[in-house]
Regions:
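Conserved N-terminal alpha-helix of the aminotransferase class I/II PLP-enzyme fold
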Residues: 184, 229-253
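Noncatalytic alpha-helical scaffolds and linker/capping helices
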Residues: 104-107, 115-139
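Gly-rich Lys/Arg/Thr-decorated short loops/hinges at beta-loop-alpha junctions or inter-strand turns
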Residues: 23, 49-55, 81-86, 169, ...
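Flexible inter-domain linker/hinge segments
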Residues: 130-208, 212-220, 225-228
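Short beta-strand
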Residues: 80-85, 112-116, 206
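Active-site C-terminal subdomain of aminotransferase-like
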Residues: 1-77, 82-84
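Conserved PLP-binding catalytic core of the aspartate aminotransferase-like
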Residues: 77-106, 124-127
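Buried hydrophobic positions in well-ordered alpha/beta secondary-structure cores of metabolic enzymes
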Residues: 63, 90, 122, 210, ...
Length: 253
């Protein structure tokens, strides 16, 4: 920082030497990566705040129950489920190989993992609905020439368990006060607003050069991270399903 004069000939401090990445690398600068990482970390943290310890456990038990149910159904259809203990991921084999499953899954727009050694992998999460479960059952039943059994409510997956007692977590988690207070939409919105008011941004004043996570990130630029088209892409989706992503990557080259 150097001492200079402003347009009125009054003493003024100015930035005389800049070593910030954006000014050195210009369009090749990568400092936005810290903003991207911070955003996902904040979202994950607020997910924990909203659900709390009990909510997180309920979600986890729901995921595990669906995985156990699917494992039992697949074994009834003649598949071998090789993960004897699991949380949300199944490793599946069938004497007929993977092609019949692949064909049935593609017809319903479902992407699974097909290993070159002849087994199929799939993982479930909290976004999996009863309809999604019925579609998976349909795929594996059709591929094994079995009669599919469908469910019409989440109750079919409740109380199912396949985790050994020694692997069950016994230590408490998310016990800080903040994880016990904001479990409705209104409470959460007000909490986030209070946090926002504690921050300093371009809506209040100038911000110091170098504060890359404090620069203006308009909501319009951040909201799309929650869009299914961006964050819901299957990691093993075939290239014909990712035309939009390919265009974005080409534009960023």
């Amino acid at each position: 920082i150097g001492l200079s004069k402003d347009t009125y000939e009054k003493p003024a401090f100015r930035l005389a030497l800049q070593t910030r990445e954006q000014h050195i690398k210009r369009e090749k600068a990568t400092s936005n990566i810290c903003t991207a990482e911070a955003l996902s970390a904040v979202m994950a943290g607020m997910y924990g705040v909203y659900h709390g310890a009990e909510g997180i456990r309920e979600i986890a038990e729901g995921i595990h129950g669906k995985a156990v149910y699917l494992s039992e159904m697949l074994q009834a259809y003649g598949y071998e489920q090789e993960n004897t203990e699991f949380f949300d991921t199944l490793k599946i084999r069938h004497e007929n190989g993977v092609e019949a499953v692949r064909e049935a899954a593609e017809q319903l727009g479902i992407n699974l993992y097909y290993d070159k050694e002849g087994w199929i992998g799939l993982s479930l999460d909290e976004s999996v609905t009863v309809d999604d479960m019925n579609d998976l059952i349909e795929v594996f039943a059709q591929a094994s020439d079995s009669l599919a059994q469908y469910e019409d409510s989440e109750e079919a997956f409740e109380g199912l368990w396949a985790i050994a007692e020694e692997h069950v977590r016994e230590v408490d988690y998310l016990q800080e006060e903040v994880f016990k207070l904001y479990h409705t939409e209104t409470e959460m919105m007000r909490y986030l607003k209070r946090l926002e008011r504690k921050d300093i941004s371009l809506t209040h004043t100038m911000i110091p050069l170098g504060s890359c996570t404090m620069k203006l990130n308009p909501a319009a630029a951040m909201i799309p991270v929650t869009y299914p088209a961006f964050m819901g892409l299957h990691p093993l989706a075939p290239i014909e399903q990712v035309a939009g992503y390919m265009e974005v990557m080409e534009d960023l080259e």
